[in-house]
Amino acid sequence: MRGIILALLLALAGCEKSQYEPFFSESKTYVYNYEGIILNGIPENGLARSGIKLNCKVELSGYAQRSYMLK
């Protein structure tokens, strides 16, 4: 009986609909700040590595139905 209940719960959890397409309101502007580091070199002790740090500000706003403008 426990096995049947467990199987039903797993089947119910597996059939849940996932929404992968993002939804953004056309009347709002969304602002995101990204930061990243890129490192180059050989990952051995005593060897030099170089890198660069990137900062980015992204503005996303609605342009038309299902169309968005990225700045």
UniProtKB/Swiss-Prot annotation:
Gene3D superfamilies: Lipovitellin, beta-sheet shell regions, chain A. Pfam families: Vitellogenin_N. Produced by the liver, secreted into the blood and then sequestered by receptor mediated endocytosis into growing oocytes, where it is generally cleaved, giving rise to the respective yolk components. InterPro entries: Lipid_transp_b-sht_shell, Vitellinogen_b-sht_N, Vitellogenin/Apolipophorin, Vitellogenin_N. Residues 1-15 form the signal peptide. One of its GO terms (biological process) is response to estradiol. Induction: By steroids (estrogen). It comes from Xenopus laevis (African clawed frog). This is Vitellogenin-B2. Disulfide bonds: none annotated. The keyword Nucleotidyltransferase does not apply. One of its GO terms (molecular function) is lipid transporter activity. Keywords: Phosphoprotein, Signal, Storage protein.
